Amino acid sequence: MGCFGYLLLIIGLHQVLATYPIWWSLAVGQQYSSLGTQPIPCGTIPGLVAKQMRFCRNYMEIMPSVAEGVKIGIQECQHQFRGRRWNCTTVNDNLAIFGPVLDKATRESAFVHAIASAGVAFAVTRSCAEGSATICGCDTHHKGPPGEGWKWGGCSEDMDFGSMVSREFADARENRPDARSAMNRHNNEAGRTSILDHRHLKCKCHGLSGSCEVKTCWWSQPDFRVIGDYLKDKYDSASEMVVEKHRESRGWVETLRPKYTFFKPPIERDLIYYESSPNFCEPNPETGSFGTRDRECNVTSHGIDGCDLLCCGRGQNTRTEKRKEKCHCIFHWCCYVSCQECMRVYDVHTCK
C-alpha cells in the first residue's frame, strides 16, 4: 500500500477506532502468525473490551482459532470481491485493517462483519472437531433420530459451540444503544446463521467387500466457499434501513427499520445497511477508497469485472504477457501423465 495506505489510516482515525473491531488485526498481525496453535496472550490483542478480555482469559486455547477465523473470513472476502471496484483490500500492520472504509454503515461493512463472524464460528468448530482444544469436541446432541438405513457415528461438528464463541466474542463490543451496533449485531448473526443453514450429513459405509451393510453419518460444516457465495448473494440483495431515535429509561436509543415498506422486511439471514457506498472509482483517503487504477479487468465481460465498469469509464491499457504453461500432455500406461512446457502470450488489460 505504501504511503497511501498509511494516509488512509490517519484520516479520520479517531472516528474509525471508536466503532472498529480492532481485534480483527489478529488476522494480519505478524506477532500472531508464528504462534500456530499456541495460546495468544490476551494482553497483546489490541482493542479488546472488558468482556472480550474475560472471554479470552477463560478460553485462551481457542484464541488461535478465533484469529484463524478472521483470517479465512478476510481471504474469502477478497475472493468474492476480486473483480469489483472495492476488492476487500486490507492495510497491513495497522489496527484498522480496512482503513476508514468500514467506518460507514454500508453494504461492504455489512458483508465484512458477516463473513468475519462466520469465519470465527467456522474455525472454532473445525478446531474442536479436530481435537485441537480440550474445552470442546464433537457434538453429542444429534438433533433427531437416525434415518432409515443409517445410524449416528463419527464426529458431528459442534457448530453451536462455534457460533457461541463467535457471538460472545465478536458481539461483546456491540452493546451500545445506537444504530451501528444494532446493524453489526444483526449482520454478525446472519454470518453465523449461514453456517447452521448449510450444514449437511456426511456418511460412511461399512461392510464386507465394499458393501454398505451399515452406514454411519455425522453433521458437517459446509465448505467455507459455500458460505462466501451465500453471503455474497445476501450482499447483493441487502436491505436498506433507516435510523429511528426514541427515548427509553436509559436514555436515547437508536433502532433500525426498513426504508422501503413495499419490500419484504429483512429476516435474521439477510444483511442490512443504512448508508450508501462510495463508488470506489478514485482514491479517497476519507472514504478508504484505493480507486481502480492499474487494476486488471476483463475486456470481454459486461459485468462489474469488465473494463467498462471496473475502470469507471476511463478506459484501459493493454500489454502482452508471456506465461509458461503445461501442454501436449500424454497419459502413459500405467499410470502417469507427462507434459511439455509451452510459452503462451496473453493480452492483459488494466484500468487507466
UniProtKB/Swiss-Prot annotation:
PROSITE patterns reported in the protein's UniProt record: WNT1
Gene3D superfamilies named among the record's database cross-references: 3.30.2460.20
Q: What is its main location?
A: secreted
Q: How is it modified after translation?
A: Disulfide bonds have critical and distinct roles in secretion and activity. Loss of each conserved cysteine results in high molecular weight oxidized Wnt oligomers, which are formed through inter-Wnt disulfide bonding. Palmitoleoylation is required for efficient binding to frizzled receptors. Depalmitoleoylation leads to Wnt signaling pathway inhibition.
Q: Which cysteines are joined by disulfide bonds?
A: 77-88, 128-136, 138-155, 203-217, 205-212, 297-312, 327-342, 329-339, 334-335
Its signal peptide is 1-18
MF terms in GO: cytokine activity; frizzled binding
UniProt keyword annotations, A-Z: Developmental protein, Disulfide bond, Extracellular matrix, Glycoprotein, Lipoprotein, Secreted, Signal, Wnt signaling pathway
Q: Which domain of life is it from?
A: Eukaryota
A biological process from GO: neuron differentiation
Spell out the subcellular localization from the entry: Secreted, Extracellular space, Extracellular matrix; Secreted
Tissue distribution is:
At neurula in anterior neural fold; at tailbud in dorsal midline of midbrain.
Give the positions of lipid attachment, kind O-palmitoleoyl serine.
209
Respond yes or no to whether keyword Ribosomal protein is given for this record: no
Pfam name, any one: wnt
Q: Name one GO cellular component term.
A: extracellular space
**Glycosylation sites recorded in the entry for this protein:** 87, 298
Q: What does this protein do?
A: Ligand for members of the frizzled family of seven transmembrane receptors. Functions in the canonical Wnt signaling pathway that results in activation of transcription factors of the TCF/LEF family. Required for normal embryonic mesoderm development and formation of caudal somites. Required for normal morphogenesis of the developing neural tube.
Q: Which family does it belong to?
A: Belongs to the Wnt family.
Q: What is this protein called?
A: Protein Wnt-3a
Its taxonomic path starts at: Eukaryota, Metazoa, Chordata, Craniata, Vertebrata
